[in-house]
Amino acid sequence: MASQGTKRSYEQMETGGERQDATEIRASVGRMIGGIGRFYIQMCTELKLSDYEGRLIQNSITIERMVLSAFDERRNKYLEEHPSAGKDPKKTGGPIYRRVDGKWMRELILYDKEEIRRVWRQANNGEDATAGLTHIMIWHSNLNDATYQRTRALVRTGMDPRMCSLMQGSTLPRRSGAAGAAVKGVGTIAMELIRMIKRGINDRNFWRGENGRRTRIAYERMCNILKGKFQTAAQRAMMDQVRESRNPGNAEIEDLIFLARSALILRGSVAHKSCLPACVYGLAVASGHDFEREGYSLVGIDPFKLLQNSQVFSLIRPNENPAHKSQLVWMACHSAAFEDLRVSGFIRGKKVVPRGKLSTRGVQIASNENVEAMDSSTLELRSRYWAIRTRSGGNTNQQKASAGQISVQPTFSVQRNLPFERATVMAAFIGNNEGRTSDMRIEIIRMMESAKPEDLSFQGRGVFELSDEKATNPIVPSFDMNNEGSYFFGDNAEEYDN
């Protein structure tokens, strides 16, 4: 990316900061993380959670969801204007799990949103600290990415379910700002645009009037975000055309689907950050760690070090495998749902198995499940090595890939071949280069066809020992390229239903 100079780093996006040097960025990210930790400790006190209960990931998620709900201005306004029976728009809550007489019990709690906002602001030096809220949203998004597949959503917008590696961040709310946009995959943004265009086709007034003007601005902004993720001139030129269209319709939808497919080989830049559950930050703050003074980075060694010495528990359903539950949460913590399993496994120091072979469902527990039958176990979130998270798609080459997911979106900046099944991807392009963008389409297809098998991505980049904090001695792993590398291969993951 030659244009690096014009971009803010993700940490700056994350903290809403202007240009800062590395030390300032580390300090402001640290301030954000410390605020989340202080908030979590205060909530545990208010809810009278024991130390053990405070380390339960399900409790962490409930507390996180409560603060997100308390600050969701739009929804709060909507709820007040459209009162629904039995819902108090001023309150938020969820299940809290407590250990009573050797058994887990579920307790549904309700809290004033105003009270939660007060605790949050108090933990964040009186500020709204939107960066911290976005950080929590990204953690939830990463957890969804590792837990569910989005086949139905892909099919509904006319995309191919095998394009799931492009769907990072597909459950992130619109209000997640620049930091949220940075972690969204090409397919996610293409899908948001397709939905807008479809509404415009069905509703004559969608682009008209004062509202329509705002809609148009949002449309063009989203086009620019997607354009910025592409790394080739032809893909970007095609995005310009989609953006400039007077009256977006089926031609634009076709172009977007074409571009999304092309990203399976000509990968887009998608940021990856390790966002951990609030209880992990709470534990560190409680043990006296000063995040702001020490500084923190979401893309370096810090999250790995934090997870090395945090003990987090999870409720386990009777037929679930605790090791598999740990893998799911580990992948979510490092935003590695679409990473090559061989790379993840090498870094983690344990075999990482595809989603279809995991004996575990999601982390959250439905209100109709019987909690008393459940046990809790420690999540194994430690790693053998650490690696720098990437914000680029890496260059491409050809490898055997799978029947389910046919490409990867790298998370870790580690030298490897990037697998994709050229025959499968290219089959989708046959005979579809009609229309006004034909020359760009031809150019993109030509680039895809000439993507070389032997090109290594992230040349010379490796993983590091956990003692190597300054990343001085890269270890470049060698991978067995005959093994399956896709997580959603031949998959039976549950669908994400909001």
Curated annotation (Swiss-Prot):
* Motif extent (Unconventional nuclear localization signal): 1-18
Cellular component aspect of the GO annotation: helical viral capsid; host cell; host cell nucleus; ribonucleoprotein complex; viral nucleocapsid
Superkingdom of the organism of origin: Viruses
Q: Which stretches are tagged as biased composition: Basic and acidic residues? A: 8-22
Q: Where is this motif: Bipartite nuclear localization signal?
A: 198-216
Its main localization is virion
User: Mind listing the UniProt keywords for this protein, alphabetically?
Assistant: Capsid protein, Helical capsid protein, Host nucleus, Host-virus interaction, Ribonucleoprotein, RNA-binding, Viral nucleoprotein, Viral penetration into host nucleus, Virion, Virus entry into host cell
GO BP term, example: viral penetration into host nucleus
Under the heading InterPro entries, the entry gives: Flu_NP
Q: How is it modified after translation?
A: Late in virus-infected cells, may be cleaved from a 56-kDa protein to a 53-kDa protein by a cellular caspase. This cleavage might be a marker for the onset of apoptosis in infected cells or have a specific function in virus host interaction.
Region feature Disordered, mapped onto this chain: 1-22
Q: Where in the cell is it found?
A: Virion; Host nucleus
MF terms from GO for this chain are: RNA binding; structural molecule activity
**Assembly and oligomerization:** Homomultimerizes to form the nucleocapsid. May bind host exportin-1/XPO1. Binds to viral genomic RNA. Protein-RNA contacts are mediated by a combination of electrostatic interactions between positively charged residues and the phosphate backbone and planar interactions between aromatic side chains and bases.
Q: Identify the HAMAP family for this entry.
A: INFV_NCAP
Q: Which family does it belong to?
A: Belongs to the influenza viruses nucleoprotein family.
* Role of this protein: Encapsidates the negative strand viral RNA, protecting it from nucleases. The encapsidated genomic RNA is termed the ribonucleoprotein (RNP) and serves as template for transcription and replication. The RNP needs to be localized in the host nucleus to start an infectious cycle, but is too large to diffuse through the nuclear pore complex. NP comprises at least 2 nuclear localization signals that are responsible for the active RNP import into the nucleus through cellular importin alpha/beta pathway.
What's the protein called, per UniProt?
Answer: Nucleoprotein
Organism of derivation:
Influenza A virus (strain A/Swine/Ontario/2/1981 H1N1)
